[in-house]
Amino acid sequence: MLSKSPAPQNTLDRLTAAALAWGEGTYARWAAPVGAIAFSLYILLTAFMALTMPDANWDMLPYLAIAEEGAYPDAQALHDYAYSTVQAGVSAADYKALTDDGGGFRSHMAQHAADFHSLLGMYRIKFLYAEMLSTMSSVMSPVEAMRVLQVVSVLLFGMITLLWLRTEGVLALAPVAGAVLIMADFGDAARASTPDLLCSALFLGGLLAYVRGREAATAVLLFLAFMARPDNIVFLAIFAVLLLVFRQRAWGALAGFAASFVAYFAISHWAQHPGWWPHLWFSSIEQHYNMDGFEPPFSVGAYLKAFAASFIRAISINSWVGVSVLALAAWFALGRAGFRLDRRAGILLAALVLGVLAKFTVFPIHDTRIYFPNLLPPYLLLVGPVMALWASASLNGRRPIAIPGDKP
């Protein structure tokens, strides 16, 4: 049974209550700027960590190779360039970790240029990232260019998030967005030298443009996000189908999908991508040392084994499943309370959720970075219903609260 809190009995209690009331009132008046400043500090700290404490991952080598492939047509020369460039840009301990795993995959690739070159089709398809690295490498060292590109991606992602919150009038909730990013391993994505965060920033910008009805910007940004990571075609296809089924007018998103659909086949052919099944085999079943002509027969058993292994890893060591389930629970709870998204936003949220499920089904890999673009947007879409619920609770809170045992 609930009961009223006892009235302060001494000076200390009264001072504490007064201080809490003052703090609550002050924060309520300054919640928006405080939220924006707190989130900005988090973004700046993340950018600083990306620049000063970057993660030296093996994917740096093939990404640097494809960025300068035109200047080194010979496989051995390209191999030597990539490895020497990374060696000059990372610590001795990091370089040893990238090139010596006791005779395993990394040791083999450090010594066999032809096999290393055969893997590049799986990286060459990230066309936009490679071109940006190549351009930036003309004015700075290639490894430094990777780090600067990560910093730019972090800042761009943070700016778009703040802009989204500002357009909704909910900058006070910016720290909550920061908490979601922490749960979604934003820091790890920022420190990794991969195209994932660049794609996420462009993707988030495209979704904001869609929500605001800026069709041209939607088309351009979603297409650029696809060019950074072509696996975004899965989300774009689902989004386009939902828009057509529910007859939602959004030519920007449809144009972005159409352009990406055409570009997907053109880029795959140009990049000499090995294909879906060989790539899945390499990523989730077994790291094959030479992808030239590698065409393993499709096996339902091998696919299901890869699916199960990735699913177990995803729920045990990664965060994207939990973040996604929490967003779904919030969507359901708000809907049951009568605070629903409008039609346009609801279609987008459904596409984001289905996009994660479809991406994992098509290409079961457990890493959070693969699904990161889809993790924050559902929460940003739900801020409207959350604020409506908050306003409703505030209005109801003005009425006297009946406490069992009280006399009328």
Which stretches of residues belong to each language-model region?
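Specific aromatic-rich, kink-prone transmembrane helix
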Residues: 160, 180, 198-217, 377-381
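Interfacial juxtamembrane loops and adjacent helix segments
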Residues: 73-122
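Hydrophobic, aromatic-rich transmembrane alpha-helices
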Residues: 313-343, 355
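Membrane-interface helix-loop-helix junctions at transmembrane boundaries of multi-pass membrane enzymes
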Residues: 167, 247-254, 329-350
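Transmembrane-helix signature of polytopic, membrane-embedded enzymes
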Residues: 144-145, 161-183, 201
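Perimembrane helix-loop-helix junctions
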Residues: 14-15, 234-261, 336
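Loop-to-helix entry region of an early transmembrane alpha helix in multi-pass inner-membrane enzymes
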Residues: 115-127, 131, 139-156
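Membrane-interface alpha helices of multi-pass inner-membrane proteins
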Residues: 204-206, 216-230, 236-244, 259
